[in-house]
From Swiss-Prot:
Residues 93-336 are annotated as: LipB domain. This is Octanoyltransferase. In the reaction, the free carboxyl group of octanoic acid is attached via an amide linkage to the epsilon-amino group of a specific lysine residue of lipoyl domains of lipoate-dependent enzymes. Substrate binds at R170, G171, G172, D173, V174, T175, Y176, H177, S244, I245, G246, G257, I258, G259.
Length: 336
């Protein structure tokens, strides 16, 4: 593999050549993200979610998302790059202050090591990086996880399925990563602004999902992550979680990040109690498309929507490292 393929580039908003549509089933090695890629129409679904119904209910009293204290994020509609109410669009953001590197399909230990390399660089003033990656099937245990408590199968069964388990330093409980899930590791300076940073991550995902045609995406007060409208199944209402979030802060810089279910095999979430939440079901963009008659989604569409949303959400972010004493750390306790 050419060494240049692993190097990040400045996140520019100029139009790049249009690559062919790429589905979740077709992967390449680590590659630079091409913005304004063509909207792939190759089907991304894996047959999950048959027969579910969605009532279109939206719980009242949800707070408006903010990208800073007191600053409301513009409401978005499914049309890409168009903000309602005259809000700023991605084309107005000349250059983001972070790099974007697409690592393709990469085993979890290698991605974990890459995060730490990027952290060491950012901690001494290097340019922040957003790592995009998919993982082979794997379970990770956050700081809240008790050994095996929310894993509902034996380690022997997981080993037979080729699913590894790793204890990591992020906040939260157990979660699943696998093909069809877009994982974004935001190696950004944070310091003590952990809660504000988590809200910004949520806002970026909400904006991306709005661009993809899911305007009901929203945070869930009291829990980290992003949800769509709940569904009633067999007389019980279940929250529908589409994106998990869990971070750690070391040397004032964030590790880990988000896992957005694009066209994930949702059956694998049956191996665990996701994030330890018994009244929550995991969903995906493709499942929501199936239920709403929206066709199919590609991983490239999701990457484009998410990176555009990050550029907008973090356009006014304070990228300086806060004045925290050397060697001091803060670890978040975010639900994955």
């Amino acid at each position: 593999m050419p060494k240049s393929a692993l190097m990040s580039s400045s996140f520019q908003t100029s139009v790049s050549p249009r690559p062919l549509p790429v589905s979740c089933a077709s992967r390449t090695a680590a590659r630079k993200l091409s913005l304004y890629c063509s909207e792939g129409r190759t089907r991304c679904g894996m047959g999950q979610g048959k027969g579910w119904r969605w009532p279109g209910h939206r719980p009242p009293g949800l707070p408006s998302p903010t990208n800073r204290v007191g600053q409301s994020v513009p409401k978005w509609r499914p049309q890409p790059h168009k903000a309602a109410g005259g809000g700023r669009t991605i084309r107005d953001v000349k250059e983001a202050a972070f790099d974007v590197l697409d690592l393709g399909l990469l085993p979890y230990p290698q991605a974990w090591a890459r995060q730490k390399q990027e952290l060491a660089r950012v901690a001494v003033g290097g340019r922040p990086t957003l790592l995009l990656v998919e993982h082979p099937a794997v379970l990770t245990l956050g700081r809240k996880a008790q050994e095996g408590e929310n894993i509902v199968v034996t380690r022997e069964y997981l080993a037979a399925q080729g699913i590894d388990v790793f204890a990591v330093e992020r906040g939260g409980d157990v979660t699943y990563h696998g093909p069809g899930q877009l994982v974004a590791y935001a190696i950004f300076p944070v310091g003590r602004r952990v809660r504000d940073f988590l809200r910004l991550l949520e806002n970026a995902v909400v904006t991306a999902l709005g661009t993809l045609g899911l305007p009901d995406a929203r945070p869930n007060p009291g829990y980290a992550g992003v949800y769509v409208d709940p569904r009633e199944i067999n007389g019980k209402t279940y929250d529908q979680k589409i994106c998990s979030i869990g971070v750690a802060i070391k040397q004032n810089v964030a590790l880990h990040g988000i896992g957005l279910n694009v066209c994930t095999n949702l059956d694998h979430f049956d191996l665990i109690v996701p994030c330890g939440l018994t009244d929550t079901q995991m969903t995906s963009v493709q499942r929501e498309y199936d239920l709403r008659g929206l066709g199919s989604v590609s991983m490239e569409q999701a990457k484009k929507a998410l990176t555009d949303a990050f550029a907008l959400t973090f356009a006014d972010y304070d990228w300086s490292l806060p004045g925290v004493a050397a060697g001091q750390e803060a670890l978040s306790v975010a639900s994955p």
